[in-house]
Amino acid sequence: MRDYLKYCAYKIQYKQKGYLDLSREKFMYPTTLLPLLILVSEITPNKTIMPENRDLANYIQVARGQHLTDDTKTYIPLTKLPKQQRDASFVVEKIRRLAEDTEIAVENLNELIYIVEELIANIYEHSEFKEAYMFAQRYKNRGVMDLCFVDDGITIPRSFEKIGIIYNRDLHAEAIYNALHGLSSKREPGRGTGLKSVGRLVREGFEGEILIVSGFGAVYAAAKGEPLFITLLEETEFKGTLASIRVPLKKAVKSLYDFL
């Protein structure tokens, strides 16, 4: 949650001052970097003070110009999802290759790919997005991977509105929590299990962390402790949905079927 709130602070800075000052930044996690890259790409170049750190500055410049770099062994750069779900398999393969470089156990890899496929499917089936992006980072020394997806779709609360379930802005976090526990905007039997099983697999299987931000709500959940609910300020409303996970790659994971 802290990493997303860091992005919120920069968004408020831009709204209040009319520019972004990133000069002191040396490193950012995907939950900060992905939405920030999108914000930077939307504003004029002279409204951003770039980081003094050359590596981070170069990366932001690349993303702003929409010229995507080749994948490295430690991260997948800002990647735009295609309009059609059938064309999105390359995203899954990028993440598979990144995870395989950690000597991840086959069982863990299967569970990780399930999570990725479900998060991608959720974007296509529910969000009605115009643009969606992914960013991934692997931390070899820590043995963990961060994955972050964002879309500019109708948000989780608005998706529920379409079937008559209304959440006012103070309850957007509750809508997200309910989605993570099986409530679906699709009326067909058996729907709603995807995001629920993803949440359980991340927290209970990998003993990792998951953050979902949508509209005025944000929910963070980890293996230990109670979920954290936040209602966002007017200035930090997320016009779409952000899904971010952190998973340990080498920890033994229970069977996927324990979480379906």
Predicted regions and their residues:
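N-terminal assembly/transducer modules of large multi-domain enzymes
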Residues: 1-65, 239, 244-260
